[in-house]
Amino acid sequence: MLLTQTTTPEDVKALDRAELPLLCGEIRHAILESSAAVGGHVAPNLGVVELTVALHRVFNSPTDKIVFDVSHQTYAHKALTGRAYTYIDPARYGEASGFANPDESEHDLFAMGHTSTSVSLGCGLAHARDLAGDAYNVITIIGDGSLSGGLAFEGFNNAAELDSNLIIIVNDNDQSIAENHGGLYRNLAELRASNGTCERNVFRAMGLDYRYLDAGNDVLALVDALQELRDIDHPIVLHVSTAKGKGFEPAQSDPERWHHVGPFDMATGRKLCPGHPSKPAPRTYADITGEALSAAIERDSQVVGITAATPYIMGFTPELRAAAGKQFVDVGIAEEHAVTFATALARSGAKPVFGVYGTFLQRAYDELWHDLCLNDAPATILVFGASIFGTTSETHLSFFDISMLGALPNMRYLAPACMEEYLSMLSWSLDHREHPVAIRVPGIGLVSRPDLAPAEDADYGVARYNVVRQGRDVAVLALGDFFKLGERVANRLAAEYGIEATLVNPRFATELDREFLDSLAAEHRVVITLEDGILDGGWGERVACYLACTPVRTRTFGIAKGFPDRYDPNELLAQNGMTVENMAAEAVRLLNE
């Protein structure tokens, strides 16, 4: 097996040319086998195997600097830079990060996982090289989907002013996470159709040299093309056409659904339920969101769904997107534009709903502040994956959202504890015309709690906490999807200590029910808060601050500020004192002081 003997760039250079296609086949098979067991970014990685092998054949990493945009497509790169074990040894599957990680290897220059950064990083690397008088190559690889992010164009604009080596490889597979959208992609299609010769050329228009290679999955053709560009003395774009999902028919025929997947059956391509290989995946909040919004779109021509290249998180399948027509807009990987676009829609009488991962909403903070909230536009933002139990890579952490949105005037951030509350809040937000509304979609699986179901005419215009169980002395306020955890704490207080605690479902992540807190302070001696996010600037701190001038003892539970990486969620909770046993004991300790 070539791959077991080819684990460094030097090994790649030592192979005969005829062995390179064989190596590519082995890497592709290893990526598939390991991803079938632990999940991963399957389609993107299968499409760049040949390009990655060619890069390490031609260039001398880490002396030559190679930067993969997003870095979700670095599996082959990792296999060829000392980390093949994570793809060929079942006992070590998933051991290496799914993204670039400088702590793993000197060949990974930056910790990264968000899109459109590579060209800017390349410009910085090239400028630093020139200042130092060095002469190495700087190569960035950016997928065509990442070109829809504004930062990419800021980088291209700056790159055109360099007068030294910078090789920008545009990996064009005619696909973002879902299909591409926007005028840029019409030009890329024209360039592909004309073999790079059409007169209209967005890269040349920005002042960059340009070459095109149609054979983006031919490793020998790629080696030859890169050899010609090695040590070039000016910035150049190499535009290569590749097939996303190359070599695995399910991924190649449906690259959107195979962009990132959990464990799957390699023989059939069927997705598997973790822990229950024979069961299909369960229903999700994405499913019910797609159903609810599709029904709203059918009823009301002013409802507009918006996504930044991730329609699947809102449950919008290709069929639902087609049915919605102009009432569903994919703006590409452009969260900043999505927020400002939604602002104008809302101020013009439409009812926009922007669904976005919490980790990606961070990119649009100024637009949330300056455009949405300053203009008090009644748009709805659905924040997905904002949980300790969401993506655990340090590059995709999503639990800073409560602190982030809580600082914004006019923003109402709702935190449902179950699907019944979520659907009620979503329905209310569509007709709410006074302020921006964000909803923190629960991140710990679909939970049905009919006992928490709001009234049909529920109004979330004023912060009102929901007392689920009335008690005395101790109050447990558990926000959003941590309500169930708070319920367990209250149950333990009763069973272990004989304390009947008041159990509260707050529902509002950035606003306080001051009237309720005043009454709470009059009847309780201890208040503990639980939230699925960081403590600094969080909801619990607001509660504690409000109660600080009362006799009530307050203890906030959440996660310490930091960048935990590939953590076990339950271990992280334990490290932060958030076990049921500890939280109950802490409440009792405060009560007895």
What role is predicted for each listed range?
Residues 29-36, 95-111, 133-139, 317-329, ...:
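Glycine/charged-rich beta-loop-alpha catalytic/anionic-binding loops adjacent to active sites
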Residues 266-275, 390-392, 412, 534, ...:
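Peripheral docking tails and interdomain loops at the edges
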Residues 108-264, 270-278, 282, 286, ...:
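Glycine-rich ThDP/TPP pyrophosphate-binding loop and its adjacent helix/strand module
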Residues 38-40, 64-67, 110-111, 134-149, ...:
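A short, small-residue-rich loop immediately preceding and capping a beta-strand
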Residues 86-96, 161-173, 373-385:
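A glycine-rich helix N-cap at a beta->alpha junction
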Residues 1-79, 204, 215, 219, ...:
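N-terminal amphipathic, basic-rich helices that act as targeting or association modules
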Residues 65, 248-362, 367-377, 477-480:
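Non-catalytic terminal/interface segments that mediate subunit docking, oligomerization
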Residues 41-162, 303, 317-318, 457-460:
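Cofactor-binding active-site loop characterized by glycine-rich and histidine/acidic residues
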